């Protein structure tokens, strides 16, 4: 449901917002992908943004160097690495962000409607990647308006309405 507080909840969990009450305990490296293009500089190329986003997540240049080809290959944006991100479509930004966030091997991955844009083929590929991450013990929190997608991917789900939990 729109306006239910889903994105706000993910921002609290990832530390972007402070909770008005209580606290959030996290254990392990967390990688949030909260807004389309968040963490990207639109003036920089795709390649430059891979290193920028990696640095923002706390990874060294050497580490990103070792993962660069894997990021580019998964994103399927080889021909666009030297193009400024301001010229990317929303689907291309989603591909790049998702590819970076998943290749750095977080313990907790937070995705806010990232899989709602782009083509069906890449969504399916991304869902397969998420399933393999589950198998390796990664916790994935994601927002989706697609009940079918939630049923395919999740072993637990919750529904929010106006900031209240109405189903778990």
Map each language-model feature to its residues.
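Short, glycine/charged-rich "phosphate-handling" switch motifs in NTP-dependent
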Residues: 156, 168
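Conserved ABC ATPase "signature" region
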Residues: 51, 63-80
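A short, surface-exposed alpha-helical micro-motif characterized by mixed small hydrophobic
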Residues: 150-152
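ABC ATPase nucleotide-binding domain signature region
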Residues: 4-55
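Conserved ABC ATPase "signature" C-loop
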Residues: 162-163
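A short, proline-enriched helix->beta-strand linker immediately N-terminal to the Walker B motif
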Residues: 102-111
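H-loop/switch region of ABC-family ATPase nucleotide-binding domains
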Residues: 144-145
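Helical segment within the ABC ATPase nucleotide-binding domain
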Residues: 123-136
């Amino acid at each position: 449901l729109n306006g239910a507080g889903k994105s706000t909840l993910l921002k609290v969990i990832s530390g972007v917002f402070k909770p008005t009450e209580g606290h959030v305990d996290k254990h392990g490296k967390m990688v949030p992908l909260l807004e389309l293009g968040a963490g990207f500089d639109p003036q920089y190329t795709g390649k430059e943004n891979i290193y920028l986003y990696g640095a923002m997540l706390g990874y060294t240049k050497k580490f990103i160097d070792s993962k660069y080809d894997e990021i580019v290959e998964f994103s399927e944006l080889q021909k666009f690495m030297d193009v400024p991100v301001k010229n990317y479509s929303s689907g291309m930004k989603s591909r790049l962000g998702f590819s970076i966030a998943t290749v750095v091997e977080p313990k907790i991955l937070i995705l806010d409607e990232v899989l709602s844009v782009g083509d069906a083929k890449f969504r399916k590929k991304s869902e397969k990647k998420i399933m393999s991450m589950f198998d390796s013990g990664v916790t994935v929190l994601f927002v989706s308006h697609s009940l079918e997608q939630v049923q395919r991917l999740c072993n637990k789900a919750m529904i929010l309405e106006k900031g209240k939990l109405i189903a778990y």
